[in-house]
Each structure stands twice: as C-alpha cells, then as structure tokens.
C-alpha cells in the first residue's frame, strides 16, 4: 500500500524565528523533504520572496511541489533533484545568488521510515535498500552482502556507535554464506540475535540500521562537503540553520561552526551557544522530534 508523503516539520517555530524570513528574500532549503519548512519560510518571505529546494528523493520533491502548488507559491520556488554535496553547482544552475537564509534538516522523513519499500525500517519488512535517492548507488543489501567482516564492523561501530559491532558483523557474514540478505526483517532478526535482545527503549537493530543508512548515502562525507559551500552562498547577515538528529551529525556541525567563527578572518557568528531542542509539547505530538538539535550562525560581512 502506498504511503502519503507525510512529514511533520521539526522545530518549525524555532526555525522561522531564527531565519526570520523577510519579503523579497532568497532562501535555500537544502533538504526540502515534504516541504513543511519550505512552505512556511516561503509564505513568510512574501511578497517577492524566492526559495530553492533541493532533495535527493524524487518523491519528496513531488510532495513539496504539490504543497507549494496548493498554496499558490509554486512560481516562487525552484525544486532541484540532487545531493546537497553539490550545493554550489545546483544553486548556480538554478540561477540563485546569495541567500538570506539556508536550512538543513538532516533527518530521514516519516514517509521514508514508514514506507517498507524504501528499506529504512526494521519494524516493517521490505527490500533492504536504504537509499535516499533510489536512482543512485549501492543499496544496503549490496553492502551487507559484499563488504568484509572487518569493513562491516567498522561501519557499524563508527556510524552506529554500536559496541556489539564485531559480533553483529560476524553474524551477518555467517548468515550470508548460505543466504544473501534481501529483506529488512531478515537483517533485523540476525542483528537482534547477535546483540542478544532489546536493551532499554531502542530496538537492538536501531544502531546497525542507522550505520548502514549513513554508509549507503555517504551522509557524513556529504555533510562535511556541503557546509563550506553553504557559508559561501550566504549573503552578509544571512543565517545558516542546521537540524541534526544524532551525535555524529551534531558533532560535525558544531565543530564546523566553531571553526568558521574563530581565527583571524571568521566568516560566521554563532547565534546558538547551545543547540535549540524541541519543547516537551512538540515531542509529545511528534516523538520522532525528540533527538533534534538546531544550531544557527550568521554570516559576517
């Protein structure tokens, strides 16, 4: 059964407060998703505001286009299919110059998590895919069936911060000798057996699935590649806002902002000395928001 592209924008009020969209401003949503943030920013930037929306997932772009069309704002937006690692090229091709605000929402959408066919979920069986862009690159099945035990252990430990990484990698390699992995439920079961059951609130496969998703989509490498481009594209006084969902992303963002705000010729001023997190009310309404952290900086110049 098809799942409608539903994704509740996280920290929406806080994002609008921090970006402070103004009429005739130019804005970039580098992870446009279902268009929740994009629509709110574009509405606040009228009259005359424009928005460039980028996403690796064609389904996300279609959902955003429909949302902006319904709001009568599609003519004020340009939507591009691609990776935010190519931010500068995509912006130039779309005819945008300096931006007054740039947003990254690094979370996987509810649509992607809740659509078994996308292969992100360990709670609903589907093909073991995990690609944010289904037209590009290796799938998670390719990785677990081809990589060495050591390579798998390194990925699961580094990207999932999973202490049972070696045990999980060994179990994966043993299983695939007789039956290559094809389905998410199959991998989740093997991982759960290797870990030895649930520990606390999270499913035993949570960290392994996170690690594979990061590896499949080269998420951390692409984040490191895009952040300097984002600063280059900001107008003086423009703001960069980044929402992260796990410690690996947040560490990269935090260290990058600190580096850009220091030295002889700093390019940024940090606005959020500590990250902004969701209110208890937002988490109650949208439990997937609970780990979100928003960091913001302003372009000097």
Curated annotation (Swiss-Prot):
Database matches in InterPro entries: RsmH, SAM-dep_MeTrfase_MraW_recog, SAM-dependent_MTases_sf
Which EC number(s) does the record attach to this protein? 2.1.1.199
The record's Gene Ontology biological-process terms are:
rRNA base methylation
Keyword set, alphabetical order: Cytoplasm, Methyltransferase, rRNA processing, S-adenosyl-L-methionine, Transferase
Q: Which residues bind S-adenosyl-L-methionine?
A: 35-37, 55, 84, 105, 112
**Molecular-function annotations in GO:** rRNA (cytosine-N4-)-methyltransferase activity
Q: Where in the cell is it found?
A: Cytoplasm
Q: Might you report a single GO cellular component term?
A: cytoplasm
Query: What is the uppermost EC class here?
Result: transferase
**Catalytic reactions on record:** cytidine(1402) in 16S rRNA + S-adenosyl-L-methionine = N(4)-methylcytidine(1402) in 16S rRNA + S-adenosyl-L-homocysteine + H(+)
- Tell me its family: Belongs to the methyltransferase superfamily. RsmH family.
Q: Which NCBIfam families match?
A: 16S rRNA (cytosine(1402)-N(4))-methyltransferase RsmH (TIGR00006)
Q: Please describe what this protein does.
A: Specifically methylates the N4 position of cytidine in position 1402 (C1402) of 16S rRNA.
Instruction: From the Swiss-Prot or TrEMBL record, give the protein name.
Output: Ribosomal RNA small subunit methyltransferase H
Native source species? Chloroflexus aurantiacus (strain ATCC 29366 / DSM 635 / J-10-fl)
Q: Which gene encodes it?
A: rsmH
């Amino acid at each position: 059964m098809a799942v409608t592209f539903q994704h509740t924008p996280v920290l929406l009020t806080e994002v609008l407060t921090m970006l402070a969209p103004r009429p005739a401003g130019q804005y970039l949503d580098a992870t446009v998703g279902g268009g929740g943030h994009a629509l709110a920013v574009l509405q606040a930037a009228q009259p005359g505001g424009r928005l460039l929306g980028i996403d690796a997932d064609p389904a996300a772009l279609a959902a955003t286009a429909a949302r902006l069309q319904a709001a009568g704002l599609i003519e004020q937006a340009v939507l591009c299919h691609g990776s935010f690692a190519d931010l500068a090229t995509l912006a130039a091709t779309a005819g945008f110059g300096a931006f007054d605000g740039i947003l990254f929402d690094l979370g996987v959408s509810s649509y992607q998590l809740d659509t078994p066919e996308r292969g992100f979920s360990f709670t609903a069986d589907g093909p073991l895919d995990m690609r944010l862009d289904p037209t590009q690159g290796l799938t998670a099945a390719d990785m677990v069936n081809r990589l060495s035990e050591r390579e798998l252990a390194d990925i699961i430990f580094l990207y999932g911060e999973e202490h049972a990484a070696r045990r999980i990698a060994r179990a994966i390699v043993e299983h695939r000798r007789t039956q290559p992995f094809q389905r998410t439920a199959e991998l989740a079961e093997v991982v759960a057996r290797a870990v030895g059951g649930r520990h606390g609130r999270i499913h035993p496969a949570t960290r392994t699935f996170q690690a594979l998703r990061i590896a499949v989509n080269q998420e951390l490498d692409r984040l490191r590649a895009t952040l300097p481009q984002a600063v280059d594209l900001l107008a003086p006084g423009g703001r960069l806002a980044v929402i992260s969902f796990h410690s690996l992303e947040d560490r990269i963002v935090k260290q990058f902002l600190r580096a850009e705000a220091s030295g002889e010729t700093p390019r940024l001023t940090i606005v959020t000395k500590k990250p902004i997190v969701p209110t208890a009310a937002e988490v109650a309404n949208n439990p997937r928001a609970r780990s979100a952290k928003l960091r913001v900086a302003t372009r000097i110049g």
